Amino acid sequence: MKYDLIIIGSGSVGAAAGYYATRAGLKVLMTDAHMPPHQQGSHHGDTRLIRHAYGEGEKYVPLVLRAQALWDELSTHNEEPIFVRSGVVNLGPADSAFLANVARSAQQWQLNVERLDATALMTRWPEIRVPDNYIGLFEADSGFLRSELAITTWLRLAREAGCAQLFNSPVSHIHHDDNGVTIETSEGCYHASKALISAGTWVKALVPELPVQPVRKVFAWFKADGRYSTKNRFPAFTGEMPNGDQYYGFPAENDELKIGKHNGGQLIQAPEERKPFAAVASDGAEAFPFLRNVLPGIGGCLHGAACTYDNSPDEDFIIDTLPGHENTLVITGLSGHGFKFAPVLGEIAADFALGKTPSFDLTPFRLSRFSQ
């Protein structure tokens, strides 16, 4: 059997692509080296932020707004919502370049963002402590996503729509010829007109020339109470420290508040180098500088997890066909800020398989930018 699209890597982007391509009427085979959702990539840990006024640059805003519409639609397929509109407050020094980008994105796209000075911040959320020179940019319409629930939902919907799924079966080789794409797996060879490579951190095992660096990252849950929950209108947050370190976190659930540090981490070259949480001495203390200064009421570390970023050199996404192989799309280099975009990236992949021109300007995400 020849498929219209084979998906290599069915985590966040791959799971979304499988659903949207199958829903569009294509014959699709989804593959993964593990059984998604799983602990081997970048989608576990229950929650991920979604922000609209994007500190990483205005070029992302059209993508994230389309993603939000798709998240809202996906949430209708579950009793438990996938998107929780908790609001997100972005904290940092008034001269922060990241916050300047947030404000610029909000102005350009007329997004609902409220600027609060330090006094107003601490009045609205007495649990938060910031220096006098700090501000907060509050996005009331943003929030967080249930990442593993989202992937489970996409996989179920794709399967119900007739999508073939081959999991726990790593792809060892990809071959291109005039008839399309062939993949080799432990279960045999499979053929398709087009392929999506969304293999996450270890994409270089299949495409060694891609400029992607795996980075071991950790996040952890700390003792909290009801003051830090959505019931008390406590928001999700990002926070920039005076030294430039970037943190992110979520409202407490079951008296546990999850937080992680966005920058830093350990460069790794192989899956076995991603040691479990607490294997690196600094893991449990990584969030202390933020918690001690900004959320002093939070208690000790309860547990944590390790994940992996697939960092591109400039930490912008890579969305492009492979050089010399126009029938193979690669989506990688999501650099620790990609999950919120998973549905729109999956939709872009489905449009690629359908032969449609993308609805977005993807020029900033081309591979050619690294050779200029």
Swiss-Prot record:
EC number: 1.5.3.-
Residues found modified as S-8alpha-FAD cysteine: 307
Top-level taxon of the source organism: Bacteria
Cofactor: FAD
Keywords for this protein: FAD, Flavoprotein, Oxidoreductase
Residues at which FAD binds: 4-34
Annotated catalysed reactions: N(alpha)-methyl-L-tryptophan + O2 + H2O = L-tryptophan + formaldehyde + H2O2
Co-factor note (free text): Binds 1 FAD per subunit.
Gene3D superfamilies, per the entry: D-Amino Acid Oxidase, subunit A, domain 2, FAD/NAD(P)-binding domain
SUBUNIT field: Monomer.
Protein name: N-methyl-L-tryptophan oxidase
